[in-house]
Curated annotation (Swiss-Prot):
It comes from Brucella abortus (strain 2308). One of its GO terms (molecular function) is metal ion binding. Pfam families: IspD (PF01128), YgbB (PF02542). The gene is ispDF. It catalyses: 2-C-methyl-D-erythritol 4-phosphate + CTP + H(+) = 4-CDP-2-C-methyl-D-erythritol + diphosphate; 4-CDP-2-C-methyl-D-erythritol 2-phosphate = 2-C-methyl-D-erythritol 2,4-cyclic diphosphate + CMP. This is Bifunctional enzyme IspD/IspF.
């Protein structure tokens, strides 16, 4: 279940808490892996918020044949019902319902839950309550101490025979009962027997921002993390021809000549497009925009760079830095650097301190030294989800 908004944990640039990074990996990706790694698990329905499809693709870029995406509803209870309905054609014998923000579910607990399932009873992992419990009045004053005997804190995944728990959810939906706090409560309401087994202290739910911080710290302490940071390089060159300006990084700069090319010949953006594509092993600019294709005749090169950035982001990549070096005797780049930097910021959606634009001459050597054209070298650094594989 991953359709919640996570108000208590707060929002971040990564989205709701199930998409926050812990140990360089999204919470939901880690949770999902526990189930995809379990040979006892068949089809997995991941229920997400209708607005979160792009977030999910970024968090879980790899494809799993046994994973289906389901759009959730306005409440957890309704999202669970929709997830169960998505499995109706398969009609599994049993189903496990798990919180997407419990990323530390272990294989041992999964196996014990499944081993205790029968056609006659569900299974609820839980921990015996160890804290002293108090009942308070409306004014906050203690009324009484509650005995801990027989009290348990419920965890997930909660497991049930599929048909009875789906029927229970459908009955609750039909009469608009929305007050159940978990699936075991719905099972109790419909008199489905539920067996409690010992849960795991590690199987905590990430509810607050502090929980996410602690989970991230825990993972980083448990093992060395090698984040998937990739660097791509690009190089391009264009010759001069008669004209009155050149376009560099999307900025028109007055000059006694223009650059010759099929598009607008923006040598800087062409090199940077190749650099971004290189971080995904996605070919080069000619692969995506062949110069033989007439539709790109005179095209603005920002189309190319924005296309490359989209490919990066669809794979969950975050552009950490771009660096462009222009090699030219003229025109002078310095007076236009700020405008060029801002143009790249706008195209890539990154801050100015992540953009570097430099220029150098070729000391009057070669075609650049003879003022026959301009060359550009670009480097892009992109951080992708997950770690570098061993």
């Amino acid at each position: 279940m991953a359709a919640g908004r996570g108000e208590r944990a707060g929002q971040s640039a990564e989205g709701p808490k199930q998409y926050r990074l812990i140990g360089a990996e999204a919470v939901l990706a880690r949770t999902l892996r526990a189930f995809t790694d379990c040979p006892l698990i068949g089809t997995i329905a991941v229920v997400i918020h209708p607005d979160d499809h792009a977030l999910y693709r970024r968090a879980v870029p790899e494809k799993h044949e046994n994973v289906i995406l389901v759009t959730g509803g306005p409440t957890r209870q309704e999202s669970t019902r929709l997830g169960l309905l998505a499995l109706k054609d398969e009609a599994p014998q049993y189903v496990l319902i798990h919180d997407g923000v419990r990323p530390f579910i272990g294989q041992d607990l999964l196996e014990r839950i499944i081993a205790n399932l029968t056609p006659d009873n569900g299974v609820l992992p839980a921990l015996a309550v160890s804290d002293t419990l108090k009942r308070a009045a409306a004014d906050g004053m203690v009324e009484t101490t509650i005995s801990r005997t027989g009290l348990f804190a419920a965890q997930t995944p909660q497991a049930f025979p599929y048909a009875p728990i789906l029927d229970a959810h459908e009955k609750a939906f039909a009469i608009n009962r929305t007050d159940f706090t978990d699936d075991a409560a719905i099972a109790e309401w419909q008199e489905i027997a539920v067996r409690i087994i010992e849960g795991s202290a590690d199987n905590t739910k990430l509810t607050w921002a502090k929980d996410i911080e602690m989970a991230d710290k825990r993972l980083r302490q448990d093992h060395a993390v090698f984040p998937d940071i990739r660097t791509g390089n690009g190089y391009d060159v264009h010759s001069f021809e008669p004209g009155d300006h050149v376009t560099l990084c999307g900025v028109k700069i007055p000059h006694e000549a223009k650059l010759n090319g099929h598009s607008d010949a923006d040598v800087a953006l062409h090199a940077l497009t190749d650099a971004l594509l290189a971080t995904r092993g996605a070919g080069d600019i000619g692969t995506h925009f062949p110069p033989s294709d007439p539709q790109w005749k005179g095209a603005a090169s920002r189309i190319f760079i924005e296309h490359a950035a989209k490919i990066v982001r669809e794979a969950g990549g975050r552009i950490a830095n771009v660096d462009v070096t222009l090699i030219s005797e003229a025109p002078k780049i310095g007076p236009h650097r700020a405008a060029m930097t801002q143009a790249l910021c706008d195209m890539l959606g990154i801050a100015a301190d992540r953009v570097s634009i430099k220029a150098t001459t070729n000391e009057k050597l070669g075609f650049v030294g003879r003022r026959e054209g301009i060359a550009a070298i670009a480097t892009a650094t992109v951080i992708y989800p997950g770690e570098v594989p061993e």
